[in-house]
């Protein structure tokens, strides 16, 4: 589970990560990654109404928080990650979500390395 200290809460953090971070698109999610200042790795979720009803959105959010909690220990202390769930995310397994998140993060870090 994603711990409270690793959750992104401020809208400014979301905005900075989405605006300045590297974006990778997977079939069920969009992953934004940005290496900012310290403070521990932070992960934020964006679950739009297009994902489904409130029950479906909360189910997707719980699954993504669990998946993010399993990878947060592998992140650099200054990493900021925002996961935007796409409507198809409500139909896939947690294992598939974790695979897509890991692949998206790996690709974002590679892209950031080639830009610098």
Curated annotation (Swiss-Prot):
EC class (word): hydrolase
A GO CC term assigned to this protein in UniProt: ribonuclease P complex
Domain of life: Bacteria
A Pfam family the protein falls into: Ribonuclease_P
EC number of the protein: 3.1.26.5
Catalytically driven reaction(s): Endonucleolytic cleavage of RNA, removing 5'-extranucleotides from tRNA precursor
Similarity comment: family membership: Belongs to the RnpA family.
Role summary: RNaseP catalyzes the removal of the 5'-leader sequence from pre-tRNA to produce the mature 5'-terminus. It can also cleave other RNA substrates such as 4.5S RNA. The protein component plays an auxiliary but essential role in vivo by binding to the 5'-leader sequence and broadening the substrate specificity of the ribozyme.
UniProt name for this protein: Ribonuclease P protein component
